[in-house]
Regions:
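Basic, Lys/Arg-enriched alpha-helical interface segments
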Residues: 1-63, 71-78, 86-91
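Residues forming the ATP-binding cleft of Hanks-type serine/threonine protein kinase domains
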Residues: 83
Length: 91
């Protein structure tokens, strides 16, 4: 059996800005670890499809949520936004 496929992970500019705004170092590390995990498993346990999100998935990292899409043909993950759980869905 061949090695596991690795997905390339891309962040939209808004997601990059949101990640930089996370002031809590522990939370930021948790988010980065979750993003890194998407390279080997773009649909980890706990990933949930967003209703009405046109293919958007959500993963949790503490109090933060990441919304992203997966392109299996291109082996790519696009992180659309990162935000605190209280306001990430309001966009």
């Amino acid at each position: 059996m061949a090695g596991a496929s690795r997905y390339a992970v891309y962040l939209k500019p808004a997601a990059e800005r949101a990640l930089k705004k996370v002031k809590d170092d522990t939370a930021r590390r948790r988010i980065v670890k979750a993003i890194d995990g998407l390279t080997t498993n773009p649909r980890p346990p706990g990933a949930v499809a967003i209703q009405g999100g046109d293919g958007l998935l959500r993963i949790r990292a503490g109090d933060y949520r990441m919304l992203y899409t997966v392109d299996d043909d291109a082996l790519a993950v696009l992180v659309v936004t990162i935000g605190h759980r209280r306001d990430v869905y309001q966009r």
